Amino acid sequence: MMKESKSITQHEVERESVSSKRAIKKRLLLFKIDLFVLSFVCLQYWINYVDRVGFTNAYISGMKEDLKMVGNDLTVSNTVFMIGYIVGMVPNNLMLLCVPPRIWLSFCTFAWGLLTLGMYKVTSFKHICAIRFFQALFESCTFSGTHFVLGSWYKEDELPIRSAIFTGSGLVGSMFSGFMQTSIFTHLNGRNGLAGWRWLFIIDFCITLPIAIYGFIFFPGLPDQTSAVSKFSMTRYIFNEQELHYARRRLPARDESTRLDWSTIPRVLKGGTGGCSLLFGFWEVRTWVSHLILHLHYGYKTKNIRWRKEIIILRGYLP
């Protein structure tokens, strides 16, 4: 009887020991994912907002006068940026299914950094609109692409805090850009014949480039596309095959009927709900016509706030 009791106790101790080791391995894996996956996407989103808010800071720090921007030029340039951002979101997400995220996200970061550098040489409003549009095409990979990446590494109960940290990094970028512009304008305005707002874009690029390099070397991408023997990557020194196998196995298997690729388009159109929603969006002409009028004719200015009620009436929300 005593032997059986000792045997049961020994089994319980061994079971607890195994469970404890698994918990330690899980925490270590999560720490590595946070350190190399979450850190890169947060840095990417942070510099995304530094670049984005930096444009507005440059506008009020001399760019408006130097380039003779008038009227709604700032609004138009921001609208061009948003058009590029919207246009680029879906293609960027589809590219993540064809090209490893380590390569694509790093490339996009480098590309918009290079375009940011080009902003310091602009001499006209047309140059600004062209660069801002292509900047937005590459920057649009960040938000939706990041949530796709995070959803591939983290379980459902692990995502909220990571998503909050990721979103917060963008807000920090907005604040940092303002402080940086103040310092640049104070110390570099006129240095080497360049206005302070031009130095802002140069320094933005100098910050963006190391982040792109960091992503290419240390960011592991997706668990399914990551190997412990990856070339040109530090993944083989960060994760071992056992950890990568566990990272893939601990998440629920993907339902192939919800797979996002080029076959998604005909699936949506064939489905009655998706097709009807698309047609309804085009049919509700009042929605986009009212915005078109507001953008092209009146513009978003304080003196035009009086038109807001008329726009709301046009859209049918008030009698």
Predicted regions: what they are:
Residues 86-126:
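Conserved MFS/SLC helix-loop-helix module at the cytosolic interface between two early adjacent transmembrane helices
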Residues 115, 127-141, 149:
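Hydrophobic core of transmembrane alpha-helices in multi-pass small-molecule transporters
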Residues 51, 67-68, 91, 99-100, ...:
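Helix-breaking motifs and short loop linkers at transmembrane-helix boundaries and internal kinks
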Residues 156-170, 191-265:
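Central mid-sequence intracellular linker of multi-pass
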Residues 1-55, 65:
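Cytosolic juxtamembrane N-terminal segment immediately preceding the first transmembrane helix
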Residues 56-88:
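Extracellular/periplasmic helix-loop-helix junction of adjacent transmembrane segments
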Residues 53, 81-90, 140, 175, ...:
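Residue-level signature of mid-helix packing/kink "hotspots" within the transmembrane helices
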Residues 56-57, 178, 263-319:
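Extracytoplasmic gate region of multi-pass secondary transporters
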